Amino acid sequence: MVAGHPGVKNHFTNGCSPSTKAFAPQYGAIGEQIRELRALDIPFEIIPGVTATAACAAMLESELTLPGVAQTVILTRYGTTSPMPEGEQLHDLARHRATMAIHLGVRQLPAIVAELLPHYGADCPIAVIHRASWPDQDWVLGTLADIQEKVAAKDFRRTALILVGRV
């Protein structure tokens, strides 16, 4: 589905461009799509978008780093369908206490909170942003102690990003 082919101008995956599939370009199918287009000798152009992490920070009017608090941002996902490499499990990453953006995890929020609590503490701020940068975006702010109840009240099930950290 590429410009120059009959009746097709753009290819979108899940309502997003391939590089921002499900608002998580690092987990999108763009690599597979590029290989297929090249194999078929079909010209294409990739137009980059704004990452979900940047969109969420902007929407929340918040920075992701702050001197003396956190100077590192970790972008990850919660591994349930694909195994995470050794050392990249959430509890390993949480040891850094950096600002963390967790993709594809809202359905596993109880497990995520359990892995974060020992490292960040119950009072650590957390935001769950549903459909960031879409007209119907919504979000919940809380702490690791109360976020599960707040998210359950909103019934977020998919297309949500979790931002955690003291910034």
Residue ranges and their predicted role:
Residues 6, 11-20, 29, 34-36, ...:
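A contiguous loop/helix-start segment that scaffolds small-molecule binding in enzyme catalytic cores
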Residues 46-52:
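Active-site nucleophile and cofactor-binding loops and adjacent substrate-binding regions
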Residues 44-46, 64:
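Hydrophobic beta-strand scaffold residues
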